[in-house]
A protein has these predicted regions:
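N-terminal amphipathic, basic helical "cap/leader" segment at the start of enzyme domains
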Residues: 1-144, 316, 322
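Conserved beta-strand/loop scaffold segments within soluble protein domains that form the structured core
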Residues: 98, 104-396, 410, 414-440
Length: 440
């Protein structure tokens, strides 16, 4: 049955919540989250974090909630034979598929790499100590909805001092056209553990997709003392899907996180991406890229929280906007009074590729401690005519010259992806996005 979001949240849906299996503590968690979701108003123009975008189209569109899980799997969202060999573990989940593979040595070492719903049914106590601890349902209406209603996602737990040499791949099919989907993703590394994880969000993303859909998700990351995680997160949803996520990482003492985030798909994508350094010596690098075209809207809200002494954060996000698209980046570095000798850096660079595109960049600092080194900056500009002229004098047509400059602009970010084949895939997507922008 098709229902708008306001109509859906206007009902109790106790029967729906009862369908989720798991221990009593998890049922209580979902029930409490649902009450938060019902009680909270939908965000709007009066909310600072939401005032630059509109959810009117989303709220007025009828969607199907929890459609037939045997619905077709989007092309390209399964795991290829080549990927199965290259990665130490692969997980494809959503839309009727649940395929998990992990090298036997990792299983024997105690690594858990499974679908969130499977863990809830089979080993619910694994979730009890982290569910909602990193991203509380109170973070927002959509965070609460995902906490209450998620029926897919990844659960990764790596035991102390275990280092996974080969990367892990998660391919998450989030939503069929015309439907709403909710995901809950958890990555937990115990003290001294390390891993490289690729989190690939997909939908029925063919360019011909005509039906609208919604994905609301949360990502909870907890890194124990001295843990080391490289996370490559790619959002490649279809062109008619709304994507809203709340994502946060907590770092204990001397933990390290390198988080590469890429936004390329969706009609509208609103993402809260936050790191909290709660242990001395914790360090985070945040690299991001986004390329909007057509009428796409990207709104990225990043937060670097320094909550302990001698912590380091370094953020570099780059974006481009073509057609009549709109991009918003808003960043904040927060330094707690106890976070002495903090080193925080925040940089945002943007290219405006057409007269109809709209770009906003809003860096921010809130420093409550002395003896810190923090800086922030943002730029919005067009392609450099001198660079274009130089390339054209070398016999390169203007369109090709523009493409080369854009590839170089994003290259600083894509080079941070530690997997060569994935770098090439991202570069090809950026090329295709530019070619589409030129055609329009």
């Amino acid at each position: 049955m098709l229902t708008t979001l306001p109509e859906f949240f206007d009902k109790e849906h106790e029967d729906l919540l009862r369908e989720f299996e798991g221990a009593q503590i998890l049922r209580e968690y979902r029930a409490a989250a649902w009450q938060n979701a019902v009680r909270m108003p939908f965000p709007g123009k009066k909310d600072e974090a939401w005032r630059r975008i509109s959810l009117d189209a989303l709220l007025s569109t009828p969607l199907e909630f929890f459609p037939d899980k045997k619905a077709h799997l989007p092309a390209g969202t399964g795991i290829s034979a080549r990927e199965a060999v290259f990665y130490a573990g692969t997980l494809a989940t959503g839309l009727g598929i649940n395929e998990a593979r992990l090298e036997p040595a990792l299983e024997q070492a105690g690594v858990i790499f499974r679908d969130y719903a499977d863990v809830e049914r089979g080993d619910p106590l694994l979730l009890a100590d982290i569910n909602g601890k990193v991203v509380p349902p109170a973070d927002g209406k959509f965070a609460a909805a995902a906490s209450a209603l998620a029926d897919r996602g990844v659960f990764l737990h790596i035991p102390a001092r275990f280092r996974i040499e080969k990367p892990l791949l998660v391919r998450l099919a989030a939503s069929n056209p015309g439907s709403a989907a909710f995901t809950h993703n958890i990555i937990k590394l115990e003290a001294g553990a390390s891993a490289v994880v690729v989190l690939d969000f997909a939908s029925d993303g063919a360019a011909k997709q005509t039906e609208k859909g919604l994905h609301a998700g949360i990502l909870e990351i907890h890194l124990g003392e001295g843990a080391d995680l490289t996370l490559v997160e790619l959002q490649k949803f279809g062109p008619k899907l709304w994507n809203i996520t709340h994502e946060r990482a907590i770092l204990e003492r001397d933990a390290r996180l390198h988080w590469v985030y890429g936004a390329l798909g969706a009609a509208l994508s609103k993402n809260f991406i936050e790191t909290s350094l709660i242990g001395e010596g914790a360090e985070v690098k945040m690299h991001g890229f986004y390329f909007a075209g057509g009428e796409q809207v990207f709104d990225l809200d990043t937060q670097q929280n320094h909550l302990a002494a001698r912590t380091t954060s370094d953020l570099l996000y780059k974006g481009a906007a073509a057609g009549s698209s709109k991009t918003v980046w808003e960043g904040m570095i927060y330094v707690d009074p106890q976070a002495m000798q903090t080193d925080g850096l925040q940089t945002n660079r943007n290219l405006v590729l057409s007269a109809g595109a709209e770009v906003s960049a809003l860096p921010g600092l809130e420093i409550l401690a002395d003896d810190v080194r923090c800086s922030h900056g943002a730029t919005i500009g067009k392609l450099d005519e001198d660079e274009l002229f130089y390339l054209q004098t070398r016999g390169i047509p203007r369109v090709e010259a523009e493409q080369l400059i854009i590839e170089g602009f994003f290259g600083e970010i894509t080079a941070q992806v530690p997997i060569a084949e994935l770098q090439s895939e991202i570069t090809e997507i950026i090329k295709a996005r530019f070619e589409l922008a030129v055609q329009r």
